[in-house]
């Protein structure tokens, strides 16, 4: 779903550390009662919240009513964009500059050392020249597949 009007996202405040248990209980309860809970999300970077996608707030209330670890009865309504920010992993992009030596940590050239030729931040790519004595070549690879080497 891409932010359509037929369903909303509701953030439920729960006991920190009990998010997965609460999500499991909500899923079982929704299945047993025939509630229209479309998805259940346990955000990896935020403790104490479970996000439900549902059309009717009454279904959210019925799914969470009487649950031991639910702290607030009234859920927070979230926008699709806010949910995506919580769910998408943040990739830490290393600060690279031309001439710097890096190690390739993934892909076909994993484990090889290379020298940075060009960095394209907008595309998330780096062009490198491999420093292996038997395999001299240049390659353009994703920037998250390299890490700077301490010299």
UniProtKB/Swiss-Prot annotation:
A Pfam entry, by short name: Spt5-NGN
Molecular function in Gene Ontology: translation elongation factor activity
Keywords, ordered alphabetically: Transcription, Transcription regulation
Alphabetized SUPFAM superfamilies for the sequence: Translation proteins SH3-like domain
Classification via InterPro entries: KOW, NGN-domain, NGN-like_dom, NGN_dom_sf, Rib_uL2_dom2, Spt5_arc, Translation_prot_SH3-like_sf
Domain of life according to the entry: Archaea
Biological process terms in GO annotation: regulation of DNA-templated transcription; transcription elongation-coupled chromatin remodeling
Domain KOW intervals: 98-128
Protein role: Stimulates transcription elongation.
Family: Belongs to the archaeal Spt5 family.
Subunit relationships: Heterodimer composed of Spt4 and Spt5. Interacts with RNA polymerase (RNAP).
Protein name in the entry: Transcription elongation factor Spt5
Record organism: Aeropyrum pernix (strain ATCC 700893 / DSM 11879 / JCM 9820 / NBRC 100138 / K1)
Encoding gene, per UniProt annotation: spt5
């Amino acid at each position: 779903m891409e932010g359509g009007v037929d369903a909303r996202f509701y953030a439920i405040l729960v006991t920190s550390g009990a998010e997965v248990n609460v999500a499991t209980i909500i899923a079982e309860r929704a299945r047993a009662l025939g509630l229209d809970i479309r998805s259940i999300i346990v955000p990896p970077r935020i403790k104490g919240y479970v996000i439900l996608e549902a059309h009717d707030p009454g279904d959210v209330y019925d799914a969470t009513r009487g649950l031991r670890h639910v702290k607030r009865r009234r859920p927070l309504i979230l926008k699709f964009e806010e949910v995506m920010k919580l769910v998408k992993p943040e990739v830490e992009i290393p600060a690279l500059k031309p001439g710097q030596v890096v190690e390739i940590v993934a892909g076909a050239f994993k484990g090889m050392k290379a020298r940075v030729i060009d960095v394209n931040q907008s595309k998330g790519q780096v062009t490198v020249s491999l420093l292996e004595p038997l395999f001299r070549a240049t390659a353009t690879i994703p920037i998250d597949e390299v890490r700077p080497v301490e010299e």
